[in-house]
Curated annotation (Swiss-Prot):
GO terms for molecular function: calcium-dependent protein serine/threonine phosphatase regulator activity; nucleic acid binding. It comes from the Eukaryota. InterPro entries: Calcipressin (IPR006931), Nucleotide-bd_a/b_plait_sf (IPR012677), RBD_domain_sf (IPR035979), RCAN1_RRM (IPR034906). Belongs to the RCAN family. Coiled coil: none annotated. Inhibits calcineurin-dependent transcriptional responses by binding to the catalytic domain of calcineurin A. Could play a role during central nervous system development. CDD domains: RRM_RCAN1. PANTHER family: CALCIPRESSIN, CALCIPRESSIN-1. Residues 163-173 have a biased composition (Acidic residues). This is Calcipressin-1. The modification Phosphoserine is found at S108, S112, S163. Interacts with RAF1, PPP3R1 and PPP3CA. Disulfide bonds: none annotated.
Amino acid sequence: MHFRNFNYSFSSLIACVANSDIFSESETRAKFESLFRTYDKDITFQYFKSFKRVRINFSNPFSAANARLQLHKTEFLGKEMKLYFAQTLHIGSSHLAPPNPDKQFLISPPASPPVGWKQVEDATPVINYDLLYAISKLGPGEKYELHAATDTTPSVVVHVCESDQEKEEEEEMERMKRPKPKIIQTRRPEYTPIHLS
């Protein structure tokens, strides 16, 4: 992100106004402006209706500070009005800055990894050697009890299935024993051309 520098403009105040009549009625607006004209004659107002804010620009910072001291958190038409010094935002460039390249290498890897990057080693797989030992002792159709049953737990028994290769060989033998199906040709329908009839 680009560097932002907030500076306060001590010759401008922002008034947070709860009463929306200021933005639509000229009499209310004149009353509001008269509050601040007592502190400075060369004053300008900018009304921001959607934000319910008014920017008040004074000719010097002393009159702005005096107005804030006297009018901050005072009531205007029955509602509290708050005054703050306006902030001006100075950005180093008028263009948007690119985002920080924190973890972008994961999205599209560069030619070389960033400094300090270490490859994470995959954890070794969990191998149950008891199960492998039991399977190695068994033949097809036999079973092996890994854990005997107790009052609270069931027993764990391994059944070894027949291999797929043996099944495939049996199916192939059955196919060879079956007679080949006879394909009966479909007879062609009778056709007489229209121009001959």
